[in-house]
A protein has these predicted regions:
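Rossmann-fold scaffold of SDR-type NAD(P)-dependent oxidoreductases
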Residues: 8, 77-85, 130, 172
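Conserved mid-core segment of classical short-chain dehydrogenase/reductases
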Residues: 63, 71, 85-101, 142
Length: 240
């Protein structure tokens, strides 16, 4: 029987290439996604066996439906990979509590609840890998709600790593910068941008090599280090 992994956020290009990387290790996939047709197309384009994929077309906001599916799983899971997220618009979220709440649900509350609910079904020696963001390393006005949600997620993963250590479950924190997905529309130096395929390969390798925290792009690690050295009384005057 093949080991099974769950990928949440299966419609993304990162997930497409994660399918390719983990498929080589003979896994079966349980995929949660917003667009089932897109996931099916990913599988076809990569020429993968569709019988190794179970696809659930669910909204990020509908966590209760996710729980029902988890309750029906009658086998252990080897790994969980959380790729989903949404940046949002802080100017709109400051004026609309519902939008702000949705940002926190999508980027913090839902991944925490989903992972926590799955832990009893996770095999000892398994893994949890979560894509966070450099936006979670220091608060910025242009990423106000998204960044604070990702900061909470990074802290949760640190605590979870301690909590699951005795079970031999490996917790992997992924910290990307800019990734050239379909929605990417930021003008930036090419050195700051990573392709979805390279991102997926780095995630795969970090799980294989049990790297607990990885930056997808080394330049972002340097930038984050420098930003964290700036005193708050100076940092507050910046606009980025």
């Amino acid at each position: 029987m093949r080991d099974k992994i769950i990928i949440y956020g299966g419609s993304s290009l990162i997930s497409k290439y994660l399918f390719f990387e983990f498929y080589k290790d003979d896994y079966e996939f349980i995929v949660f996604c917003r667009d089932k047709k897109k996931v099916t197309l990913h599988i076809e384009n990569l020429k993968l066996d569709p019988s190794r994929f179970t696809i659930h077309n669910l909204s990020l906001e509908d966590i209760d439906e996710n729980f029902k599916i988890i309750d029906n799983l009658n086998y252990k899971i080897k790994g969980i990979i959380w790729v989903a997220g949404a940046v949002g618009n802080p100017n709109e979220e400051m004026l609309n509590a519902e939008l702000a709440k949705n940002n926190y649900y999508i980027n913090l509350i839902n991944p925490v609840l989903f992972i926590d609910y799955l832990i009893p079904k996770l095999s000892d020696g398994g893994f949890i890998s979560v894509v966070t963001s450099v936006a979670g390393l220091r608060g910025r006005a242009k990423k106000l709600f998204y960044g604070s949600a990702k900061a909470g997620l990074i802290n949760y993963l640190s605590g979870l790593r301690q909590f699951l250590h005795k079970r031999g479950i490996f917790v992997n924190t992924i910290i990307p910068g800019y990734i050239s997905t379909e929605r990417f529309n930021i003008k930036a130096s090419k050195f700051l941008i990573t392709s979805p395929s390279k991102t997926a390969k780095m995630i795969y390798q970090s799980i294989k090599n049990k790297k607990e925290i990885i930056y997808i792009n080394f330049f972002w690690r340097i930038i984050s280090f420098i930003l964290n050295l700036i005193p708050e009384k100076i940092f507050k005057k910046f606009n980025f």
